[in-house]
């Protein structure tokens, strides 16, 4: 497949495709294009999608429930191995075959199951404490749905998901009259 064909599928330019891929090594052959199978394997490895990631979910409220039910996580290699909450009425109940545990067991489970990622779906008031505990237990990254910025060591990547800010960005783009800005 040529860089032009890849570019048209990604709504970008052929030059941008070649430039982006060059950051990760040599791909394809001049005049022949790219082997899609080889490109797929190499990109999956670069993105860390060639393995299963152990994930715990902290927060069994509405956002946590929606995230847990999302089928693409499992299909893409994200295995939710445990759920935690502080609500006594939720502790001990099950979502599918997964039991909701007391958040006091967070560190032990992270260490025991060698958890890679934590999804925080907790109130702002609990986010920093949970993040600190998860980092101390050895987690390697955090997806933060709490409406607050958390502070962790620079070695721990954090992705903040703020739905209100994303809606504001979308409404700004619509107000400005451009979808591609």
Positions of predicted regions on the chain:
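HTH-adjacent hinge/linker in prokaryotic transcriptional regulators
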Residues: 4, 9-55
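Phosphate-bearing ligand-interacting subdomains
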Residues: 4, 93, 97-181
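Alpha-helix termination/capping residues and helix-transition junctions
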Residues: 49, 75-77, 112, 136
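Short active-site oxyanion
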Residues: 54, 80, 116-118
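Glycine-rich Rossmann-fold phosphate-binding loop(s) that bind the pyrophosphate
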Residues: 60
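Hydrophobic/small residue at the entry helix of a nucleotide-binding pocket
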Residues: 63
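NAD(P)-binding Rossmann-fold cofactor-contacting core
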Residues: 74-98
């Amino acid at each position: 497949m040529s860089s032009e064909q890849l570019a048209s599928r990604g709504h970008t330019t052929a030059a941008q495709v070649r430039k982006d891929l060059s950051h990760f090594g040599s791909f394809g052959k001049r005049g022949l294009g790219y082997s899609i199978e080889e490109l797929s394997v190499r990109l999956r490895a670069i993105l860390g999608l060639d393995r299963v990631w152990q994930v715990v979910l902290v927060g069994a409220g509405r956002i946590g429930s929606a995230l847990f039910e999302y089928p693409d996580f499992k299909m893409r290699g994200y295995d939710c191995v445990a759920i935690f909450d502080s609500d006594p009425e939720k502790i001990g109940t099950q979502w599918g075959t997964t039991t909701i545990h007391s958040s006091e067991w967070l560190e032990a489970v992270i260490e025991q199951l060698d958890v890679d990622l934590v999804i925080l779906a907790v109130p702002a008031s609990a986010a920093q404490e949970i993040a600190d505990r998860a980092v101390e237990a050895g987690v390697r990254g955090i997806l933060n749905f709490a409406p607050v910025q958390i502070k962790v060591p620079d070695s721990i990547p954090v992705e903040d998901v703020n739905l209100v800010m994303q809606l504001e960005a979308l409404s700004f783009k619509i107000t400005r009259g451009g979808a591609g800005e």
